[in-house]
Amino acid sequence: MPLLSRITGPADLRRLHPEQLPPLAAEIRAFLIDNVTRTGGHLGPNLGVVELSIALHRVFDSPHDRILWDTGHQAYVHKLLTGRQDFSRVRAKDGLSGYPSRAESPHDLIENSHASTALGHADGIAKADQLLGVDRCTVAVIGDGALTGGMAWEALNNIAEAEDRPLVIVVNDNERSYAPTIGGLAHHLATLRTTKGYERFLAWGKDALQRTPVVGPPLFDALHGAKKGFKDAFAPQGMFEDLGLKYLGPIDGHDIAGVEQALRRARNFGGPVIVHCLTVKGRGYRPAEQDEADRFHAVNPIDPYTCLPISPSAGASWTSVFGKEMLALGAERPELVAVTAAMLHPVGLGPFAKAYPGRTFDVGIAEQHAVASAAGLATGGLHPVVAVYATFLNRAFDQVLMDVALHRLGVTFVLDRAGVTGNDGASHNGMWDLSVLQVVPGLRIAAPRDAARVREHVRQAVAVEDAPTVVRFPKGELGPEAPAIERIGGVDVLARTGPAPDVLLVAVGPMAAACLDAAALLAADGITATVVDPCWVKPVDPALVELAGAHRMVVTVEDNGRTGGVGAALAQAMRDADVDTPLRDLGIPQEFLAHASRGEILEEIGLTGTGVAAQTAAHARRLLPGTGTRPGAQEYRPRMPLTDWSEPA
């Protein structure tokens, strides 16, 4: 009987004989390769933590002891060992989350997949346990480059303050985040990997001196006072110990017995301890181990033998179009530089970095520093393009506001994965950036609808030298081009379905396709519409306000939360201009969305052509006397109630 099928929880794991653990590890790797290559997901990080996860659940009593996974994408093995072995729909609608999920299991305590936060959680949990008299250990596993984030070091500084608070920090050191980890800390950890001789030398010296008659013990005591100097010279773990943190390691993270021994020592110490484990991302799957780009960090469904995509891409992606345009701009403008935060390839900067390595700055998982450093680059006379996932720019809002916008600096932010992302769940949806950035004075935002507009808007953005600019686009493949039939001011008119249209459909970026489909459906229902793309959604173009006044109703459609988004900004601009046309804003509900595909989520929240048409028709029938009704039309019921404004916005 396979070992894995006998594991329904950590207690079953602890009953296994040590000789059974390597076969179990091999079984888990085979399971991961078989399942994750079929469904897609984070393969490389999880192959690297198999033995570490086994050891953690054998030494600590989860969920009584708290095990926290920083970033969380390396928690697949943890899920398997805590009774969740149905990976057939991992990251799919109604399947397991690709991250820890409190709704799934009491073994999952935190589920935020943004990096460098687990140590802060662990600090607070350990403090709460101490104050409430709860006897248990808190364990935080951090790796995949998360120690390059400043939050982790802020937490370490506080954790070290209490020497009697049981907290174990496991550093999963695989030398990588998405790609190889960069920066001084990476070099420091690399140094620790190569100084095993220090501990052997110290142990030999202690033994030899203490066995020497008369002078041995006093001499050892004197030399022991010089321990810090030896450590700083030979093994820089002194950096951790100078903070007041006990350091154990480095340890082979694939040696279960060795990891268990270190974890038991750490647990019994009773204070904050760092256990430094050396692991190999992609361990046990040769294609992953040989992939120098990212060790199969995250894969789409692939053939496990050929590693070819199960469903080859049918066209270019938003990311690839941006990457090619950056490469072209780099050749034209020597002052253009690229900045990213540990995601060079995922945001499309790989070609630029290869062509211009000296003009590419990957700062690690440190978004705040990325933006502040970009401000410095702009102050120095360069034009930085900061490319990150939309959800991660939230982490650097203060730097955008105070270090870039306040100084009126020409910094361009390119936000990949904007709007509904889908499979990676709530924390990866880029559904807040349009709302958050609306409040930044002077900042301009473009939302391209197709490949041509990506190229156009990126070029326009990097030409602005006296204010920050933003270009946002979603994850995935591009749809067909949506050419304009007319441009009014800076607004592209995409379609008119009648000589005097009733409704102005304002399509934000990739919502253009849904709005064009909706306009056709509405025309069949007797409701005529003009479909426009504002292109630059902040500030609101006066031409858009004039167009709103020329229609009987305005409907904005955006891949962003409704609160504070483009619809809200247009409503305010209309009020300021005394335009009393009723406005309805369609967008993402103000809630954390469960994981599912982008298409499934857009359909569920009504941001497809059918959904937009149904909601628009319902409002039009109520607000616009004399509008037609398509026979057999069904009322659309959104997940959350739409704002019912009986009076004009």
UniProtKB/Swiss-Prot annotation:
InterPro entries: Dxylulose-5-P_synthase, THDP-binding, Transketo_C/PFOR_II, Transketolase-like_Pyr-bd, Transketolase_BS, Transketolase_C, Transketolase_CS. It catalyses: D-glyceraldehyde 3-phosphate + pyruvate + H(+) = 1-deoxy-D-xylulose 5-phosphate + CO2. Mg(2+) binds at residues 144, 174. PROSITE patterns: TRANSKETOLASE_1, TRANSKETOLASE_2. Binds 1 Mg(2+) ion per subunit. The keyword Electron transport does not apply. SUPFAM superfamilies: Thiamin diphosphate-binding fold (THDP-binding), TK C-terminal domain-like. Pathway: Metabolic intermediate biosynthesis; 1-deoxy-D-xylulose 5-phosphate biosynthesis; 1-deoxy-D-xylulose 5-phosphate from D-glyceraldehyde 3-phosphate and pyruvate: step 1/1. Thiamine diphosphate binds at residues 73, 113-115, 145-146, 174, 285, 367. It comes from the Bacteria. GO terms for cellular component: cytosol. Its EC number is 2.2.1.7. CDD domains: TPP_DXS, TPP_PYR_DXS_TK_like. Its cofactor is Mg(2+); thiamine diphosphate. Residues 623-649 are annotated as: Disordered. GO terms for molecular function: 1-deoxy-D-xylulose-5-phosphate synthase activity; magnesium ion binding; thiamine pyrophosphate binding. Homodimer. Catalyzes the acyloin condensation reaction between C atoms 2 and 3 of pyruvate and glyceraldehyde 3-phosphate to yield 1-deoxy-D-xylulose-5-phosphate (DXP). Belongs to the transketolase family. DXPS subfamily. This is 1-deoxy-D-xylulose-5-phosphate synthase 1. The lineage of its organism: Bacteria, Bacillati, Actinomycetota, Actinomycetes, Kitasatosporales. The gene is dxs1.
